Structures are given as structure tokens and as C-alpha cells.
Amino acid sequence: MLISLVLTICAVASAQQVYVSTSGPLDPPSCTAIYVSSNILPSYHHSQFSYTQTETVRTAISAQPFPTETYGPPFSEMSHLLPALSTTSWGNWDPAATSTPTDEADPYGQAAYSALWQAASVRNFTRGIYSTTVAPTPVPKAELVVPPPLYFTPAGCYSFPCDFMLGIDSAAAQVEGAVADEGRTPAAPDFLVEFARSIGADTSDMEDDFIATENYYLYKQDIERLASVGIKYYSFNIAWSRILPFAVPGTPVNKQALAHYDDLINFAIEKGVRPVVTLTHFDTPAQFIGGNATGLSRRPLLGYLNLGYQNETFEDAFVHYGKIVMAHFANRVSIWITFNEPLTGVDTGPSVDHIIKSHARLYHFYMDELKGTGKVSIKMGAAPALPQVPSNASHIAATKHYNDLNIGTFLNPLALGQDFPDAYKQTIQDYVPLTQDDQAYLNHTLGVSYPTLALQRHFI
């Protein structure tokens, strides 16, 4: 019975599959169709027919190198804006090493570098398989076939404007690995898994950042693949504890780290990918949280994790680090992010004070001293809330409180040049007041990036 049924169907319909090769993005929808309902009832009948099913096999268009653009003078012309800097290099730290450094007299030598790692007491330290930069390999065309479009899509016509900056984002702690290589010293993310275990959290889906995806050595492979699928913007963060292993002003700059990020930026530009640089993405050097996982156990008053922003040395140290990086790369980087989601690491009132003032100092350094023509901003992590029930007065009040506390704390001074909102001053008792001069200096130094929205019905 099954065989005869199949034969009957084959006799009624014949089909042909045709593949059409093309490349590049789909044309945006014209959005001219108007939906009109109809009361006409369909009629059905049977007949023989044939059809051709055409499927477009679309391949991505690689990013194309763009004309040479500069956004400020080269470092050779800007070095006078920085204090006298010494540069050096360090080896790797290996807990299983059988020999120990002998340069104990050097406060910033290999022995001092190793001592920072020993004091960190990281557990289950592991190392990746790479120890040098891997040369990129081309991506086969067969791997660049774009998935077919969805059959069922939203009725509305949505498309990005031509100047919309769509790209890929990463963080050093999430992708680099090589955490103890070429002079990098411990940073807050190195202790996250250990900290989670210490408070009884489920760590089954967590991994230490010791290896990650080994982007530190595979960055050329990664950028080659981003460019191959047409990505035009790559946002990454430079690891502070690589550039300045001892974190604070007056300590040596790691010339290997500068060379690494210099090459990363140059290679991205060569491939037609514009670099977007973040100065810190939760990876505060461990010195600001006490040097080990214990510092993470401090319960923040407003944020989610102690990232050392409240440390009295943080502001000047971060500005010093930021100036070094900006002065070296401002001629090739058009977009700078000082902090990624600053609210996450807010511990106390001084945390907020140090964040907004160090950001503003770097903004003015870039605009007024470097004469940069790019953009400087912060990536906000707190999404604006909406009332769950728009007509409910308590939901509206809760929404205003949430937005004022989590967003207005930064936007009031940095975007509007205004004082902190009452919700912040009433919640954080040790907040640092802003003078009129502070508000004027902070004003208009912030752009905003929101990933989502929140619905609010209770005060938090």
C-alpha cells in the first residue's frame, strides 16, 4: 500500500531543485505591502503540476581594507604628554618551575613579578597549548555559506541604517588566556571561580580564565575569520595588568604587551576590521582588591562584585594607564570605551566618584591634549526599566527609583552635568558630593550603550 501511494504522488507532481550562487547581504525589505483582510472563501481541486524550487546559496562578503585613516597624532609626537616611562619585559610564571628568579634586589624584576602570582594563590592553574602567535590561515569558501533566511519572519520591516556600527565584542578575561605569560599579573577575573566556590555557588558551568580561547596567541586567526564573514568592527579590551604588571604610576611599562596590542590593531585594520578599544572590562589588577580572591568576598553596596574601584589609588592609576594606551594607539583607534558596565563593580560611594572622574579625565585628555577626532564613552550595563503596568502608580515610582539609582547615577553628571539623583544619595550614605566645578567638568563626556530593557514593579 505504501509503495503504491508513493508512486501515485510521483505521478501527480514532479520537481526540480535549482541552486543559485550569490554573495553578500540580502536586500532590505521595501516595506510597501499593506495587509488587507479578505472574506473570500478558497476552493480546492486536484490536478497534475510541476514546479522548480530555487534556493539561493549565499556566501559572505569579506570585509575590505579601508583607506588609511588617522584619528590623532602618532605616539612619537604625543609621548611628551606622559611622565617619563621605563619599559621592560618579563617571562612567564609557572608554579611548577624548578628554578627561581635571582633578581630580588629589583623591585620590578622577575622575582617581584613571580611574587605577585605566588601571593595570588590561584588554584588549579593550567596553561594552554600555544606559546607564540599563530599565523592566520585562510577560511575555505565552503565555510562561508550563509544560513538560508527564515521562512517565518516578523511582519514589520526592520533593517539597520547604513551607518549602523554592527560588530563583535570580546573581553580579555573571556578570550585571551595566557594569564601568566609575558608579564601579565593577576587580575580580578582570575579569582572568580574560586570565589564562587567559596560562597557555595554552582560552578558547574564556570571555567577559569587561565586558558579561555587562547586569543592572546590566536588573535590573527580570530580576526581573519571575523573579516571573512564581513565583520567591520571588533571591540576588545586591553588588559591593564599586561600593560602595567605592577599597576600604578612609576612602575615599568611592559613593552611586550604594547607590541602585542599594536600588532593586533594593525592586523585588524589590514583586514578591514575597525578596532574598538575598551580600557577595562572587569579585569582590574589584583593589587586593587588585596591581591587574591579574598577581596572579591567583600559585599558591594550597589554593584555585584568588588572590583577595587573604591581603592584610594585607583583613580590616578587608571588615568595613568589609560593615558599610556591612548597615546600609543589614538592615531589608529576611533572609538574608546573607558569602563564596561561600571555599575557591576561599584562597591561604595568612592567607587562611583573614582569611575566618573577618571572617565572624564581621560575624555578630556583625549579631546583636549591628544586632539583626538574619535569618540570616548562608557558601556552602560544597567538597562533602563519600564513599569510592568504603565497605569500603576507604584510601578511607575519603582521604575523611576530604579532608573535614577542604576542609570541616573552616571548619566546625571556625565551626560547632563547635573548632581546625583536623590535615589543615589539616599541609598549610598558615603557618596562623594559633586561641586559645581565637578559637574561642569563631567558634563557631556558620556555616550550610552544599552543591551536590553527591564520591567519594574517593586523598589530595589
Ranges and model annotations:
Residues 202, 212-215, 240, 246, ...:
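Chitinase-like catalytic core of GlcNAc-active glycosidases
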Residues 187-224:
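Aromatic- and Gly/Pro-rich amphipathic surface segment
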Residues 1-17:
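Fungal secretory targeting signals
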Residues 164, 217-239, 264, 274, ...:
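Catalytic domains of carbohydrate-active enzymes, especially glycoside hydrolases
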Residues 16-163, 167-170, 174-196, 248, ...:
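Active-site region of glycoside hydrolase catalytic domains
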Residues 200-201, 235, 344-347:
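Surface-exposed beta-strand-to-loop junctions
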